[in-house]
Curated annotation (Swiss-Prot):
GO biological processes: chromatin remodeling; flower development; positive regulation of transcription by RNA polymerase II; positive regulation of wax biosynthetic process; regulation of vegetative phase change; response to light stimulus; root morphogenesis; transcription elongation-coupled chromatin remodeling
N-acetyltransferase domain location: 168-315
Gene: GCN5
Catalytic residues, chain numbering: 233 (proton donor/acceptor)
Protein name per Swiss-Prot or TrEMBL: Histone acetyltransferase GCN5
The organism of origin for this protein: Oryza sativa subsp. japonica
Biased composition (Polar residues): 88-103
Amino acid sequence: MDGLAAPSPSHSGATSGGGASHRKRKLPPSSLSDATADEDDDTTAPSSPSTSPSSPSRPSSPSSSHSDDDDDDSLHTFTAARLDGAPPSSSGRPPKPESSTVSAAAAAAAAAAAPKPDSASAAAGDGKEDPKGLFTDNIQTSGAYSAREEGLKREEEAGRLKFLCYSNDGVDEHMIWLVGLKNIFARQLPNMPKEYIVRLVMDRTHKSMMVIRNNIVVGGITYRPYTSQKFGEIAFCAITADEQVKGYGTRLMNHLKQHARDADGLTHFLTYADNNAVGYFVKQGFTKEITLDKERWQGYIKDYDGGILMECRIDQKLPYVDLATMIRRQRQAIDEKIRELSNCHIVYSGIDFQKKEAGIPRRTMKPEDIQGLREAGWTPDQWGHSKSRSAFSPDYSTYRQQLTNLMRSLLKNMNEHPDAWPFKEPVDSRDVPDYYDIIKDPIDLKTMSKRVESEQYYVTLEMFVADMKRMFSNAKTYNSPDTIYYKCASRLESFFSNKVASQLAQASTKN
């Protein structure tokens, strides 16, 4: 997804003072093509208006040939002028690079999984936020996060990847990178006038944290630090489309936070996000709750109709660019402590325990013979533990016999019920060919009778009841409510529930 954040007030008018006029603006929607989103925060979405108050809007097509030619011309001409001392001839201009399609990792990569490109529209002020998706889609495992961060860190150490922060300082190489970043913003934000993007990126009060791979800019974040107020305002952020799904968006934001804290002395970031960008900001630690004193930021940034003001507090101790190492060390410390208190890390060999018909074991095995069970804290009195055991004799042997008799009685009552006929035998696949494709865990009264008679399968009443309930559930899953099978299952289930309750009451009275 592509996008930008609200521009600094100094660029909304002709002046560059920190206390520029305080006006409200609307966030017009802007369409983007070839924008993608993934669940790993690698793409971003817009968070600011797509038009400048002082410049006319551009055509909405990001693939305009004139637009691309202008972008490339500006970079080639600028490079030649700075490094060679003279502009190149128009006929000798190098061909355009193939990877001209880009996507912004703007101060906002919005929703985590957007399967369609057009769902990554920029600055969609009329978009609706899905609160459920905001939390369910943004779930990210720390294991995957750490693996990506460590991979990118290795690339940085190898020199293939750099994260550098520069402003308009007049250095040739830095200026070339800034022009490249400007082109990324311009391609990805078609409704944002180029002149306005240039004004912010090249303004000396703004800084740009850039992702540089093999000496080529592949993305960046432009922001304005208000050092006297100790907060920064994010303006633009983008990652090229062919470098997405690699974690650059998150890594870029982490570098920005650490640089803003250590170099600029900032404690907070503020930005205006549209609804599509909120998801990305939440992943990066932004919230809609503004804790920063209003006196510190009011009048320094603009209010925008259709935008959501979001804040990120920069932690003063977190190693943002080395979070993966911190997480790994924390896990190691926790794992070592667990090993001191438990032997759960020991893996025992499996058990050769073959079963025959109806799931009844060929031979019995005492729980105490299972390796590791006692070491895990098991005690013999836990065998056959049941909530309903209080209704039976405290003696285990007597309890087992009473339980078996109860289950036999229940099965007898079930078999005699007039609605039990569909459940007495296993379903014949020759009569119902697709039954076992739909019902993966079949059960019937005959199979349950075999399990009861083995006196080895049902060690608690709850196990018996669970099988019976599954039988009713299977019937209701396979058959529609208007069928006789569904109705039989409903009536028989009600009968069974009442019978279990009455039998337990009788057993409790006797004991």
